[in-house]
Amino acid sequence: MRPLTPRQAEILELIKCNIAETGMPPTRAEIAKRLGFKSANAAEEHLKALAKKGCIEIIPGTSRGIRLAQTEELEEQGLPLIGQVAAGEPILAQEHVEQHYQVDPNMFHPSADFLLRVRGDSMKDIGILEGDLLAVHKAEQARNGQVVVARVEDDVTVKRFEKKGSTVYLHAENEDYSPIVVDLTNQSLSIEGLAVGVIRNGDWQ
């Protein structure tokens, strides 16, 4: 497969995530809105380029006529590794992707959608250490007790999730850290994904 431009890679990632979350690909208008294009026509041009490179198939006559090409080359791209996440930006925005690791997403359950570089030691007591690569399954909801990647206002954090009424507690696994308390009546919180595994940085090159 021919190499992708950064913008093409970003659109391909958006398509894959949309299918994983909703079961269907985005429309051209949705792609344009998510990525700041002035019109759906701009998205269409990028889709045509992705089709020429063998990443997707375009199905005429339908607004969601995009199908991922299940090629060996596409699978070999691996999981995107997310580094520092800028405030207010989508976690899978192309500028956050440091590289791709040749990791089989299905070695985790549920399957991983991306890797997140761990910063800090707030989860060290359950073996999530500074510099580790956290395998994350993209999700928008969580059950109490699950370890989540959460966005509180503009900050992204990895913590254990607990919800009581309209209050969410994001617990560290390190006694040196107090829980992050989020009042959902006046603070924004979104779940970016669920932790499904850890790769010790250096063990997978």
Swiss-Prot record:
- Site positions for Cleavage: 87-88
State the source organism's domain of life: Bacteria
Q: What are the protein's UniProt keywords?
A: Autocatalytic cleavage, DNA damage, DNA repair, DNA replication, DNA-binding, Hydrolase, Repressor, SOS response, Transcription, Transcription regulation
InterPro entries the UniProt entry points to: LexA (IPR006200), LexA-like (IPR039418), LexA/Signal_pep-like_sf (IPR036286), LexA_DNA-bd_dom (IPR006199), LexA_repressor (IPR050077), Peptidase_S24_LexA (IPR006197), Peptidase_S24_S26A/B/C (IPR015927), WH-like_DNA-bd_sf (IPR036388)
Q: Which GO terms describe its biological process?
A: DNA repair; DNA replication; negative regulation of DNA-templated transcription; proteolysis; SOS response
List the stretches of this chain annotated as a DNA-binding region. Answer: 28-48
Tell me one GO molecular function of this protein: serine-type endopeptidase activity
Protein's UniProt keywords contain ATP-binding = no
Q: Which Gene3D superfamilies match?
A: Umud Fragment, subunit A, Winged helix-like DNA-binding domain superfamily/Winged helix DNA-binding domain
Query: Per UniProt, what is one Pfam family of this protein?
Result: Peptidase_S24
Q: Does the keyword Cell membrane apply?
A: no
Record-annotated active site = 122 (for autocatalytic cleavage activity), 159 (for autocatalytic cleavage activity)
Name the EC number(s): 3.4.21.88
What is this enzyme's catalytic activity, as reactions?
Hydrolysis of Ala-|-Gly bond in repressor LexA
**Member of which family?**
Belongs to the peptidase S24 family.
Q: Which HAMAP family does this one have?
A: LexA
Q: Report the protein's function.
A: Represses a number of genes involved in the response to DNA damage (SOS response), including recA and lexA. In the presence of single-stranded DNA, RecA interacts with LexA causing an autocatalytic cleavage which disrupts the DNA-binding part of LexA, leading to derepression of the SOS regulon and eventually DNA repair.
How is this protein organized at the quaternary level? Homodimer.
What's the protein name? Answer: LexA repressor
Q: Which organism is it from?
A: Shewanella woodyi (strain ATCC 51908 / MS32)
Q: What taxonomic ancestry is recorded?
A: Bacteria, Pseudomonadati, Pseudomonadota, Gammaproteobacteria, Alteromonadales
